[in-house]
From Swiss-Prot:
Protein's name in the database: Collectin-10
Keyword field contains Glycoprotein: yes
This protein's encoding gene: Colec10
Expression by tissue: Expressed mainly in the liver and stomach, but also in muscles, testes, and intestines.
SMART domains: CLECT
Keyword Calcium: yes
Molecular function as annotated in GO: chemoattractant activity; D-mannose binding
Lineage: Eukaryota, Metazoa, Chordata, Craniata, Vertebrata
Function description: Lectin that binds to various sugars: galactose > mannose = fucose > N-acetylglucosamine > N-acetylgalactosamine. Acts as a chemoattractant, probably involved in the regulation of cell migration.
Length: 277
């Protein structure tokens, strides 16, 4: 209905315009202005909104839009099939030397050897005796070189050496270890006396030894983590650590032990295990 009214008004406006033009063509003094001027004085307002038309056909498919943001991580999928075996990798480093194996079975007896010649041992005994004397003298000379010149002390199983470089406790541990030894551990009276005599005759007053309570306060152990169960030689009223900072041990030239602070620097004694022949 609204559309019909709009159409009717539009047709009436056109009829009026045509009538004016017709009167002008007849010379009648109706209005001397042009049709454009006449129309310009009339304001044509838009009509009311019409009814919705029928829905048009579906348009063509548009272009692909921009790629959206990455979505959240999905749920872990099922385990896939085992892949083909890969190439053989590089050989790894050589492992540590294993433990010594058990003694093997006794082998088959060998063939009987050829008969030996009769020995004229008289002259050889004299040579052997002279060699024994030479070896004894050589051992005495070697002991002199070790003790006096090189400054080494030894027992049947170990060598002991005073390192005349002032280092703190941890540096002393490292120094001995990188040279194949350990900070000296006097685990019995014999070794303790040997080291104390060594220190005194070298003209020193104190040295670091391999005893500490760095792991647990008050529980002193040797540097190989064995406890002081069988032997210790503390100075009277030692160990005493009221401030809790004296976690390392020094040996005095008297052979007595004293707990001291680990950051202090002094000479120290390394021990080395003798290689078995």
């Amino acid at each position: 209905m609204n559309g019909f009214r709009v159409l009717l008004r539009s047709n009436l406006s056109m009829l009026l315009l045509l009538a004016l033009l017709h009167f002008q063509s007849l010379g009648l003094d109706v209005d001397s202005r042009s049709a454009a001027e006449v129309c310009a004085t009339h304001t044509i307002s838009p009509g009311p909104k019409g009814d919705d038309g029928e829905r048009g056909d579906t348009g063509e498919e548009g272009k692909d839009g921009k790629v959206g943001r990455q979505g959240p991580k999905g749920v872990k999928g099922e385990l896939g099939d085992m892949g083909a075996q890969g190439n053989i990798g590089k050989s790894g480093p050589i492992g540590k030397k294993g433990d010594k194996g058990e003694k093997g079975l006794l082998g088959i007896p060998g063939e009987k050897g050829k008969a030996g010649t009769i020995c004229d041992c008289g002259r050889y005994r004299k040579v052997v005796g002279q060699l024994d004397i030479s070896v004894a003298r050589l051992k005495t000379s070697m002991k002199f070189i070790k003790n006096v010149i090189a400054g080494i002390r030894e027992t049947e199983e170990k060598f002991y050496y005073i390192v005349q470089e002032e280092k703190n406790y941890r540096e002393s541990l490292t120094h001995c270890r990188i040279r194949g030894g350990m900070l000296a551990m006097p685990k019995d009276e014999v070794v303790n006396t040997l080291i104390a005599d060594y220190v005194a005759k070298s003209g020193f007053f104190r040295v670091f030894i391999g005893v500490n309570d760095l792991e647990r306060e008050g529980q002193y152990v040797f540097t190989d983590n064995t406890p002081l169960q069988n032997y210790s030689n503390w100075k009277e009223e030692e160990p005493s650590d009221p401030s809790g900072h004296e976690d390392c041990v020094e040996m005095l030239s008297s052979g007595r032990w004293n707990d001291t602070e680990c950051h202090l620097t002094m000479y120290f004694v390394c021990e080395f295990v003798k290689k078995k022949k």
